[in-house]
Amino acid sequence: MDSLYVEEVAASLVREFLSRKGLNKTFVTMDQERPRCELSINSRNDLRKVLHLEFLYKENKAKEKPLRTNLELITRYFLDNVGNTDNSESQEVPIPAIPVPKKNNKLPLRHSETTLVNIYDLSDEDTGRRTSWSEAGKARHDSLDGDILGNFVSSKKPSHKSKAAHVDLGDSLPLVPAWEKVDQLHSSEPGIDVKKTMERTRPKSGLIVRGMMAGPVASSPQDSFRKRSLRRSSALSRKLQTPEEIQQQSEPFVHTPAYLGPQEVPDSSSDSVSRSPLGQLNELSIEKPNVTSSSQGLSQRDRPRLRSVSEDSPLGYSHTEGNSRMAQDQLERAFKRQGVQPPSLRKNQLVSDRTDDKPDALQLEDVEDELIKEDIVLFPPPSMLKLQTVSKPIDLSLAKEIKTLLFGSTFCCFSEEWKLQNFSFNDIASLKYGIVQNKGGPCGVLAAVQGCVLQKLLFEGDNRTNSNLRLQPSDAQRTRCLALAIADILWRAGGKEQAVVALASGTPHFSPTGKYKADGVLETLTLYSLTSSEDLVTFIQQSVHQFEAGPYGCILLTLSAILSRSLELVRQDFDVPTSHLIGAHGYCTQELVNLLLTGRAVSNVFNDVVELDSGDGNITLLRGIEARSDIGFLSLFEHYNVCQVGCFLKTPRFPIWVVCSESHFSILFSLQPELLCDWRSERLFDLYYYDGLANQQEEIRLTVDTTKTAPADSCSDLVPPLELCIRTKWKGASVNWNGSDPIL
């Protein structure tokens, strides 16, 4: 267990609060700006167990008006057990600082050396002014987002009446195990990931909570608050620089918007200055020598090294050269000089040199030393700053064209089945890989995406060597595979040159007029264009929550695939230009399924192009599949000689097939990749079947034996259609359902 785990638990705590309070937009924004990983906790019960809150939970349930979230339980616990201070003038509620281990330092600390910052100043309650408090269990200030306990710093007026309160945590029995675990992690604490470091460069104010921040500001409110705390704790006699002076001396480094998720990153400009952690480095190195001798938590060997890095590295700013522009090649040389590779996304490196074994009081000096080292080493490399998208809101004319292509009319709308359908996964342990379908309609889209998710899960990445873990992914693994699958589908539809991602903004961009019926979805779309597959993957990972949890996840993917291919090319793919992608009763057409599987919305499933002579000299071209597909396709219509599925779909690159049976699409797959390249493996093999709509409660495993002949059909109505589909590829094969009830 390391600090990354602590961060994910804290983030899960905030997500649970947002979910229970119905703050859906904030919830979506948080998942976009801070995507989940394997360590994220998605169950309230699991979160309660990890934090050892069972006692508080039972006590809360017995109350007349119980609290609804774990975050409120923790908050009330501290408010009830800490007590009030004697300072009636400030009327503040102190929050204890969680001890941070230090090296062999058992001397009692003076009052001025402890860092106990009040979480909320009641005297400022009417104007909503807030202050931040040192993050529990970590010797660093790395959460300008306020994503730990939701504390945001006001830039209007700080509290100068903070009073330290020494609290005995021995009475906190129910929470002691969780907090002790946090304290003991510091010796092996990895650095903040790249995303966290990028977030540190974003200024925050009260407007960010409502998503109203339009651009960067010159300095961060938390920086000025930290400087005032330094003045009080170390009794510095010299005058510190004002924020205006710091602004003049700081160099504009990178201009990033307050909302990084699915938005474009504008280029850096000299007239919009962003306060980066590198800008803080110089002022911290100036204040450091004047701190009292109580900074014993960091060895004498470490402090000169940190100062030399800030003085010699091009990352540090000089007061005489404060107006010179920092170039990206200087940043790369800085990483090279330190012997550190620029960190990749979600990769952490150890930055703490301390090997502590006993907790002591948190000191501001330790925080500053840790902050300097992290700011230098873990600043995002230039490649992470190059993710740019071209975005534009949808307009009325484009919305009309899309509706005509989808439904054949601008007066048709998406049905409720489509609007409610997202790419959420099954909670049954043996079916965690499966996407759940709520109602009929978009089953073709779900089956195609399911096949691509299985491709990523079974045959790409780390799980391909461990068959026991393939079909039991963690929540983070399956979400990651979903993001990669969506990126593959869109990149393939865009001809592997570009992709367009359609995301719902929640606000209509135009007023419907004329022959157009609004449906509440198309009118809110913002379209993001990307021309790099790497940027596309990163972008989808940041916004995958809209596809997985909604709203309109299935619709967004369908529209993104259409726009990536372009409306004109989709029409050219059709055999009949007046065809459309969604048929009667909201069912997916073969063209839509082919678009998701192969990147082309062709109307047929045979190979290549067939010329049809009408007899009067006119030749009609029927377009089929042009190349071998990653995901295959089997159809019951072939059993009835209505169509012929070509080998490009029957023998795909991966042993995964979308099955069309009885006007419904489902998925069939094998765990053996050699099934498609070694005829000996085709003698006897297993196929797994999944239907997101069939209320499937257990794994369905079919054993196919091609050495035996299927029994004669005494009554063809009793033969499961799935068996008939299987026999369109493996002629006459015997199918054993292994105890599962055959699906008729």
Swiss-Prot record:
Which keywords, in A-to-Z order, does the entry hold? Hydrolase, Phosphoprotein, Protease, Thiol protease, Ubl conjugation pathway
- The enzyme's main class, written as a single word, is hydrolase
The function of this protein is:
Probable hydrolase that can remove 'Lys-48'-linked conjugated ubiquitin from proteins.
Query: Which InterPro entries does the UniProt record give?
Result: MINDY-3/4_CD (IPR025257), MINY3/4 (IPR039785)
The biased composition feature labelled Low complexity covers: 265-277
Residues modified as Phosphoserine are S143, S220, S224, S295
> What name does UniProt use for this protein?
Probable ubiquitin carboxyl-terminal hydrolase MINDY-4
- UniProt catalytic activity: Thiol-dependent hydrolysis of ester, thioester, amide, peptide and isopeptide bonds formed by the C-terminal Gly of ubiquitin (a 76-residue protein attached to proteins as an intracellular targeting signal)
Q: Which family does it belong to?
A: Belongs to the MINDY deubiquitinase family. FAM188 subfamily.
Q: Could you cite one Gene Ontology molecular function of this protein? A: cysteine-type deubiquitinase activity
Q: What ranges does the record give for the region Disordered, renumbered to this chain?
A: 211-358
Q: List the disulfide bonds.
A: none
- An example Gene Ontology biological process: proteolysis
**Organism field:** Mus musculus (Mouse)
Q: Where is the active site?
A: C443 (nucleophile), H664 (proton acceptor)
